[in-house]
């Protein structure tokens, strides 16, 4: 795990157009600051009743993380990796790979592109964070039973939307 000071220094260097507090809170929720964190996304058809639909892995090395990714890919499941949990479906769009996404700076660079794009499309930070989470500005503000009826943006640290503008 990265220390707060190391993470913030990397965030300011590698994702300078996003406020370091924003990247810090996203990384806290997404990976717990573990650069090798992996979330395997279980297809809905394969989920058991009550499952969250995600299996989390927290390997301690890049080599161990790459082995887990290889096994997930053999199952043809989507997954997210690294500090900011970049989803495998974004790799081609951003010209990257799972291996590159285990590099904290590279992961932050891609997350910056996604966050800025989502912020522009959503019009404010809350909707932008929802988009970062789900690809749209609505899903991430809805309470989720599997997360104690909190929304993604609440887990990041925002109250439910109150129509005030927030900035990236």
Predicted regions and their residues:
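Flexible glycine/serine/alanine-rich "lid" or loop that lines and gates the nucleotide-sugar donor pocket
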Residues: 28
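Early exported N-terminus immediately downstream of N-terminal targeting peptides
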Residues: 23, 38-53
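Non-catalytic cell-wall polysaccharide-engagement segments
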Residues: 1-22, 32-34, 55-168
């Amino acid at each position: 795990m990265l220390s707060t000071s190391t993470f913030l220094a990397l965030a300011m260097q590698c994702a300078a157009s996003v406020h370091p507090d924003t990247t810090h809170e996203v990384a806290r929720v997404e990976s717990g600051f573990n650069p090798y964190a992996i979330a395997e996304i279980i297809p809905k058809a394969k989920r058991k009743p009550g499952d969250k639909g995600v299996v989390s892995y927290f390997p301690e090395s890049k080599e161990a993380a790459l082995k887990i990714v290889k096994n997930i890919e053999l199952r043809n499941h989507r997954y997210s990796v690294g500090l900011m949990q970049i989803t495998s479906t974004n790799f081609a769009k951003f010209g990257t790979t799972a291996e590159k996404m285990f590099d904290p700076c590279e992961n932050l660079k891609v997350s910056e592109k996604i966050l800025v794009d989502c912020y522009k499309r959503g019009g404010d930070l809350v909707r932008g964070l929802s988009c970062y989470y789900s690809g749209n500005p609505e899903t991430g503000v809805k309470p989720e039973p599997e997360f104690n009826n909190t929304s993604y943006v609440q887990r990041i640290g925002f109250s439910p939307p109150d129509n005030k503008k927030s900035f990236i």
